[in-house]
């Protein structure tokens, strides 16, 4: 199905005969299928000639010819065929193929998705299988698993698909032909065989032979396969920087197994055509041989026809050397190709392609902008074809029939058409307003073109039941579409006219496939959307926008399906009132316009009138809804991911609401669909999507039948549902959609209902009372239709004065009366609007976006009013039915827009401007819509970007903010990877405390100077010195305690951040730490030194004792750890204390070890004996000497020792220390020996550490 695009392109690309190539190039991809057929069939010689030329020495030219063709083809297929326009013939073929394949049929898409999931095959293969098996899933599965080789399309998956479809279509015109029909030398060989061969070639020798198949097709194959390959491989060529085109030639030469192979290796770059040359290369060798390839030509034909022989070969080659290349090509090309060529199969563009080629051309550019168009309709021979299939006049009936059931159910087709016409007009009108112009251009295209695709995407995402794309597209994909849609919307403005024409062309069909009608209009854009879809295929790999994707998946699916405000929901969080208002207004407008009331009488006339844009009700309905959608789309486009998905769902969800939904769903794609849905169906469809209930869909279908009027009555029931639904979807309700739906409901709801509804809406809106007010401002639009009136009432109700009006309005029947009431109501709204303004301001408050929109929209509103007036007059003139109502509406609208709307702009601030614009556009259903479009667009843009984006950003911000604070924690955490900050207190803190401890211990005064400065030495000596000092201060001297506490605590913080890693790697950070601590220890040392020990230790430590360090050092050196630990300690105990001062410098390390024990022993003896049990905590946290000092000393030891082997022992000892606790093995007795109490405990403790 998706293969067609590929095959068309592929075939054309590969017809290598130069003449053929030129023809193709000239004809463009459009004519490629025929040239292939001709060349393959009639021009067999030419093909071989072409192939031969390539082989013969025109390898480059052949190859290049293929390449140039390929490149073009590649661009067209892999990229969006930017430069090629489908010919009428191609379009027809595409239409036929698409219709045949039912590519747009949601059911087909679902099948494709299921098959892809079940068989884990590529979409191309799955589509091929479905095509072969008449869309029978079971047969297709069997076919895929048993008949179709795994790598059948590996090299040329995308195009191959095309081939099969083309062939199946007898579109052998695509050189590729069906891979199954590969036997078909003309198309099959060239294309089909080539195809098979292609995959084979990639895979292995046979592929080359298979290519031979291409060989006979040589030209054809070249055209088809080569084209395919060039398309697919062409990318590789480009990637590789050499003409992989050779590959194309390889396909073209087909005969040259080698070349084909070569192409594999890439060695055949350039040589593909010159099979011999390439053949010589490894690739040729790799392939069977050129000769085998030539021999295989026939085989290829046979294989293609039989598929199996080659399949076997293919399988071998796949696994063989070629296989890797195949993967490379397959991955890059397939991956990209999948995106661009045929990943998403959605009915979005399935609308009968009545759009003339000119429109297609417009589409083409659109698709050019979005490269996924060809992809979107992979089945079509060429990218243009997909457009054609969308555009084919025959399509409407067929597509309509197949999709109509779904689409009608989802969207009421009649009005969308009207909408298109209206949109046309409104586009013009909107153009008058700057905001409108931008919105209209973007909106309309979005509504039609992107929406068709995007809408389907969204529907698929949000209403998988209804949408074909539901299974196909992921949230990311939908986002991607949205992005594309957004991009396309500008391009699509040009398309709008043609779209409108299209929609006018087949109103009836339109009714059946209103969605498609829009899509027809949108078909131009749909291709774009489709292309986008094509891009969609790699959902996870290539998110269009990473940020938006989450919104789509979460918001769209989560909110969209359930609530209109999927997009708005986030907005709601952020006080999404702006999008809501925008949506609300738009929807309100649209709902009111959904004008089931007007539509009933005007709908069909409107369709005819739609062209005139005169049947305001329908037109307005469509326009308004569409405009709203468009506006919402445009705005929402800003949040394409969420908006798109939401829009699709929302659009579908509400038809009257739909406008709202569309509005709220700012997704352009959705919009097109939404627009259709917007029409009366929209409410039903919208509700349907919202509730996602078939009954709604059915109702929608019914609505489609009723043309728009039922929409009202359905709207009524739907509205009721919708109202309640929107209420449940308060955010959405908050969003225009819900509210709008409610408004529509309001219409639906009787007067009291209306009042209540309005309050419901208010309730729904309650965020949205302003929203309701916005609705009020929209009300004028609502005034246009009874629904509008009701909406107005609803809004009015939210508006203070409107209650009576609401009652009147509540009968949506009283359009004129309602308008009259509404006009006052609007005035009330106007009066109220300040209130609304206020409320909306509240909403606006969500995001000043709303207010800004308001302000911006005030101008817009005024402009809207101006336009409105114009619209009103125009509308009044145009529609008698509308006229009375509209005239009132127009006047009301104008006034409302001016005052109320402006008020509303402010008042319905959520998207007050949106509201205002919306209102304005609402006031005249037809014109109002345009205004709505404009206003909504602007408002929506603000609201969407502001509200939608802002909510996201705040979401991010909070994360970031915590992140920033926690960034330090990550510092801690980072260092705390080993230890959390909390833990840092413990183990690392334990070490950290060591730092602290050294600080507080501060290496005894002398040491502090030396060791303090030298972290390493200092830490070592510091340990000893500090330990002694610390222990005494802890037990005896508060100064030490304070030092420990102060230095330890503060230092701990730094150490955590700075030194935790250092703790682990003390050496690095440690030095800094000691330096930090020692200054503090300087003071503390004095106190600790003097106070610390029982005078003997202190004095010994301070000077005489430690001077002995050299002695200890000797011992230490002589006796590494054990000596220092045991023997040294004893010596160290006595001597170290005495010598410590003298030997502090160099002796510290050795004596430090033993003496640390001694000194530490003393320290520990006081505090640590009891404290040492808790040693681990003390290291970190212990407030007293143990925490600071002990910890510090061991840490210091670590710092010092890491260089010295004993350090390791020390580490062990630390553990042991903990284990040993008071009874340090060696230090204990030794330290005691020196200073019984002090040393005794301390040594044991420190020994444990040391």
Swiss-Prot record:
GO biological process, one term: copulation
Compositionally biased spans, kind Polar residues: 335-345, 650-661, 687-751, 822-833, 1105-1141, 1182-1194
Pfam families (UniProt xref): UBAP2-Lig
Feature: compositional bias, Basic and acidic residues: 227-258, 287-300
InterPro entries, per database record: TC-DDR_regulator (IPR051833), UBA-like_sf (IPR009060), UBAP2/Lig (IPR022166)
Phosphoprotein as UniProt keyword: yes
Annotated SUPFAM superfamilies: UBA-like
Known role: Acts in the nervous system to mediate the control of copulatory organs during courtship.
Record protein name field: Protein lingerer
Organism encoding this protein: Aedes aegypti (Yellowfever mosquito)
């Amino acid at each position: 199905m998706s293969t067609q695009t590929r095959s068309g392109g592929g075939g054309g690309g590969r017809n290598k005969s130069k003449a053929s190539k030129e023809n193709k190039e000239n004809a463009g991809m459009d004519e490629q299928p025929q040239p292939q057929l001709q060349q393959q069939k009639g021009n067999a010689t030419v093909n071989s000639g072409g192939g031969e030329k390539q082989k013969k020495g025109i390898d480059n030219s052949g190859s290049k010819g293929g390449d140039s063709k390929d490149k073009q083809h590649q661009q067209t297929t892999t990229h969006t065929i930017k430069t090629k326009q489908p010919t009428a013939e191609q379009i027809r073929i595409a239409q036929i193929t698409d219709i045949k394949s039912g590519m747009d049929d949601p059911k087909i898409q679902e099948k494709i998705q299921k098959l892809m999931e079940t068989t884990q095959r590529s979409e191309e293969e799955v589509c091929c299988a479905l095509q072969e098996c008449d869309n029978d899933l079971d047969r297709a599965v069997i076919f895929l698993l048993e008949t179709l080789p795994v790598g059948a399309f590996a090299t040329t998956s995308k195009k191959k698909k095309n081939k099969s479809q083309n062939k199946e279509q007898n579109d052998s015109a695509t050189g590729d032909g069906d891979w199954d029909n590969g036997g078909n030398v003309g198309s099959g060989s060239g294309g089909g065989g080539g195809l098979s061969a292609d995959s084979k070639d990639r895979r292995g020798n046979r592929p080359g032979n298979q290519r031979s198949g291409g060989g006979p097709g040589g030209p054809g194959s070249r055209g088809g396969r080569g084209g395919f390959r060039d398309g697919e491989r062409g990318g590789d060529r480009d990637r590789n920087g050499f003409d992989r085109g050779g590959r194309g030639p390889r396909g073209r030469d087909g005969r040259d197994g080698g070349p084909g192979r070569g192409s594999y290796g890439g060695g055949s770059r350039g040589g593909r055509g010159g099979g011999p040359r390439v053949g010589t290369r490894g690739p040729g060798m790799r392939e069977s041989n050129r000769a085998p390839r030539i021999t295989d030509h026939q085989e290829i034909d046979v294989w293609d026809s039989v598929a199996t022989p080659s399949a076997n070969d293919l399988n071998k080659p796949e696994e063989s050397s070629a296989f890797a290349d195949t993967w490379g090509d397959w991955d890059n090309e397939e991956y990209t190709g999948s995106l661009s060529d045929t990943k998403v199969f959605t009915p979005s563009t399935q609308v009968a392609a009545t759009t003339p080629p000119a429109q297609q051309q417009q589409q083409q550019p659109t698709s050019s902008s979005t490269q996924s168009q060809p992809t979107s309709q992979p089945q079509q021979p060429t990218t243009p074809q997909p457009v054609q299939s969308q555009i084919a006049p025959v399509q409407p009936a067929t597509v309509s029939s197949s999709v109509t059931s779904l689409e009608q159910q989802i969207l009421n087709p009649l009005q969308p058409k009207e909408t298109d016409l209206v949109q046309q007009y409104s586009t013009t009108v909107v153009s008058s307003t700057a905001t409108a112009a931008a919105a209209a251009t973007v909106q309309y295209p979005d509504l039609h073109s992107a929406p068709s695709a995007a809408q389907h995407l969204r529907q698929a995402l949000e209403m998988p039941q209804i949408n074909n794309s539901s299974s196909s597209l992921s949230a990311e994909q939908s986002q991607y579409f949205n992005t594309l849609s957004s991009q396309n919307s500008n391009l699509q403005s040009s398309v709008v006219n043609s779209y409108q024409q299209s929609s006018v062309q087949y109103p009836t069909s339109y009714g059946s496939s209103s969605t498609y009608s829009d899509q027809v209009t949108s078909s131009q854009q749909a291709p774009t959307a489709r292309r986008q879809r094509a891009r969609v295929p790699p959902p996870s790999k290539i998110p269009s926008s990473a940020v938006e994707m989450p919104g789509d998946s979460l918001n769209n699916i989560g909110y969209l399906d359930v609530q209109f405000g999927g997009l708005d929901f986030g907005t709601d969080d952020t006080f999404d009132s702006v999008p809501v208002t925008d949506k609300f207004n738009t929807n309100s407008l649209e709902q009111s316009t959904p004008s089931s009331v007007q539509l009933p009488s005007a709908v069909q006339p409107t369709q005819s009138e739609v062209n005139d844009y005169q049947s305001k009700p329908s037109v307005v309905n469509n326009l308004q809804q569409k405009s709203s959608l468009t506006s919402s789309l445009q705005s929402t486009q800003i949040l394409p991911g969420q908006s798109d998905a939401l829009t699709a769902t929302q659009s579908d969800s509400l038809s009257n609401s739909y406008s709202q939904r569309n509005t709220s769903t700012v997704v352009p794609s959705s919009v097109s669909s939404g627009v259709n849905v917007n029409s009366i169906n929209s409410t039903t469809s919208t509700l349907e999507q919202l509730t996602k209930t078939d009954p709604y869909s059915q109702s929608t279908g019914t609505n489609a039948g009723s043309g728009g009027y039922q929409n009202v009555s359905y709207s009524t029931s739907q509205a009721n549902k919708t109202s309640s639904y929107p209420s449940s979807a308060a955010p959405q309700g908050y969003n225009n959609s819900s509210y709008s739906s409610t408004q529509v409901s309001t219409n639906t709801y009787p007067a009291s209902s209306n009042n209540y509804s309005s309050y419901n809406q208010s309730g729904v809106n309650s965020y949205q009372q302003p929203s309701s007010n916005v609705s009020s401002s929209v009300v004028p639009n609502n005034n246009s239709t009874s629904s509008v009136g009701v909406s107005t009432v609803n809004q009015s109700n939210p508006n203070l004065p409107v209650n009576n009006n609401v009652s009147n309005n509540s009968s949506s029947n009283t359009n004129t009366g309602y308008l009259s009431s509404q006009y006052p109501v609007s005035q009330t709204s106007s009066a109220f609007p300040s209130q609304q303004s206020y409320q909306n301001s509240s909403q606006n408050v969500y995001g000043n976006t709303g207010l800004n929109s308001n302000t911006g929209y005030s101008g817009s509103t005024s402009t809207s009013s101006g336009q409105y007036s114009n619209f009103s007059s125009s509308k009044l003139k145009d529609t008698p039915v509308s006229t009375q109502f509209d005239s009132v509406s127009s006047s009301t609208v104008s006034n409302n827009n001016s005052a109320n709307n402006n008020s509303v702009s402010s008042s319905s601030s959520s998207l007050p401007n949106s509201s205002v614009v919306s209102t304005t556009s609402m006031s005249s259903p037809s014109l109002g819509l345009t205004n709505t479009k404009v206003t909504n667009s602007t408002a929506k843009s603000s609201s969407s970007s502001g509200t939608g984006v802002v909510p996201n950003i705040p979401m991010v911000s909070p994360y970031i903010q915590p992140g920033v604070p926690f960034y330090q924690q990550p510092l801690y955490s980072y260092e705390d990877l080993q230890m959390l900050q909390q833990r840092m207190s413990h183990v690392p803190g334990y070490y950290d405390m060591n730092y602290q401890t050294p600080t507080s211990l501060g290496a005894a005064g002398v040491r502090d100077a030396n060791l303090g400065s030298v972290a390493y030495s200092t830490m070592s000596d510091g340990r000893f010195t500090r330990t002694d000092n610390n222990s005494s201060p802890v037990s005896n001297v508060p100064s030490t305690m304070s030092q420990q506490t102060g230095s330890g605590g503060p230092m701990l913080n730094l150490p955590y951040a700075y030194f935790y890693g250092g703790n682990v790697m003390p050496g690095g950070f440690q030095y800094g730490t000691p330096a930090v601590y020692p200054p503090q220890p300087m003071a503390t040392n004095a106190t600790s030194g003097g106070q610390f020990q029982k005078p003997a230790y202190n004095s010994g430590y301070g000077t005489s004792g430690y001077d002995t360090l050299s002695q200890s050092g000797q011992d230490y050196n002589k006796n590494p750890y054990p000596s220092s630990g045991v023997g040294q300690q004893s010596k160290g105990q006595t001597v170290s204390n005495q010598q410590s001062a003298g030997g502090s410098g160099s002796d510290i390390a050795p004596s430090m070890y033993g003496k640390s024990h001694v000194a530490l022993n003393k320290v520990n003896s006081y505090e640590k004996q009891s404290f040492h049990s808790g040693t681990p905590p003390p290291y970190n946290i212990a407030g007293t000497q143990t925490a600071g000092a002990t910890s510090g000393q061991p840490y210091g030891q670590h710092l010092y020792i890491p260089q010295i082997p004993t350090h390791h022992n020390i580490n062990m000892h630390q553990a042991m220390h903990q284990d040993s606790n008071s009874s340090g093995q060696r230090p204990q007795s030794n330290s005691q020996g020196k200073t019984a109490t002090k040393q005794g405990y301390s040594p044991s403790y420190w020994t444990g550490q040391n």
